[in-house]
Amino acid sequence: MKTPRRFPLIALTVAAVLTAAALYWWYSHSTASTVQNRQGTEQQRASNSQGSAKRAGNAPPVQAAEALRQNVPQYLSGLGTVTAANTVTLRSRVDGDLVALHFNEGQEVAAGQLLAEIDPRPYEVALMQAEGQLAKDRATLTNARRDLARYEKLAQTQLVSAQELDTQRARVSETLGTIKADEGSVASARLNLTYSRVTAPIAGRVGLKQVDVGNYVSSGDANGIVVIAQTHPIDLVFSLPESDIASVLSAQKNGKLPVEAWDRNNKNLLTRGTLLSMDNQIDSTTGTVKLKARFDNQDDRLFPNQFVNARLKIGTLEDAIVIPAAALQMGNESHFVWVINGDSTVSKKIVASGLQGSGQVVISAGLQAGEKVVTDGIDRLTDGAQTEIVPAQASTPLPASGASS
């Protein structure tokens, strides 16, 4: 009776043990597979990373440019100051009260234009007096000549002595001299009256007025009435080293030399003109010589006392090899460039450089037209290394270029 009760209990126990064993087997195999997959993924990532690093180390990205053959203008550069072609301090030539000003400060004026008026009344009176004296002496001369004519007739009959006749002749000559002096006085008075109207001696731009209406002015005033500066045309005075004198003199034999005026930062071209003259002596203090260039300045890009950079063109270097200045490097003893070969490797080439400006440099020896030179990414290069050329617009910022020996 007791045997049937034990069989279900044993069966249940065996089933529970088998179920637990099955669950343990499934869990252990599932965990091992997951770990194995993760390890495989990490190994693949590490392999990819090492491969990328290896490729990056073998072929660093660089930017390059081709050496070009072209005509290169030859310039001499110097710092200069803009000066007015002519500068005049307008002064009154006569003394008197300033009654009117006929200009606005900063205005452009023409030669002969009325700019100021001095009280003319004293000079009008002086002119009237001079003219009156002249008229009086002319009447005296007329009367003296009539008396002389009568004396000459009477002398023929000896009714007057020779001495009286000579005296009358002297009186006529004296009156003629007086009239000459009177005519000079009239001319002087008329000129002074004209000077009461002050006109511009040159065309140009007036500055700030130095005196106000109502003040007494004279010809001895140091500041005058206003300063006029001629700015059309306008001049630029700049200096060059004495070593450049021979080049300038030689270039002048071929005609007028063009000059460019650039702003003080040497970035923007202001205007173009021509060389006007060169000083006849060297400044012994600075070892430089002064030159003067002239510009039409119709657009008023230049202003008196403005500091600008002058570029004097003395010739053209024909069929020169030109590369970007960033490609030229300085070694221990010489200049060099990195040249990209046909198999994308780089080689260091010693070169001789010439003129340099506007971001370009002339190579006088060591490089041929058409060769590609590295302009950026130079710090990463070694002789014979592989490179990858990338365009400037698509590349990430590269390390600053530097010389490598």
UniProtKB/Swiss-Prot annotation:
Cellular component annotations (GO), alphabetically ordered: efflux pump complex; plasma membrane
Region (Disordered): 35-62
Gene3D superfamilies assigned: 2.40.30.170, 2.40.420.20, 2.40.50.100, Helix hairpin bin
Leader sequence residues: 1-22
Main location: membrane
Membrane topology: Peripheral membrane protein
Subcellular location: Cell inner membrane
Any Pfam family matching the protein: HlyD_D23
InterPro entries referenced in this protein's UniProt entry, alphabetically: CusB_D23, Multidrug-R_MdtA, RND_pump_MFP
UniProt keyword list: Cell inner membrane, Cell membrane, Membrane, Signal, Transport
Biological-process GO terms, alphabetical: response to toxic substance
Gene Ontology MF term list: efflux transmembrane transporter activity
Compositionally biased region (Polar residues): 35-52
HAMAP family per the UniProt record, alphabetical: MdtA
Family according to the record: Belongs to the membrane fusion protein (MFP) (TC 8.A.1) family.
Subunit note: Part of a tripartite efflux system composed of MdtA, MdtB and MdtC.
Full protein name: Multidrug resistance protein MdtA
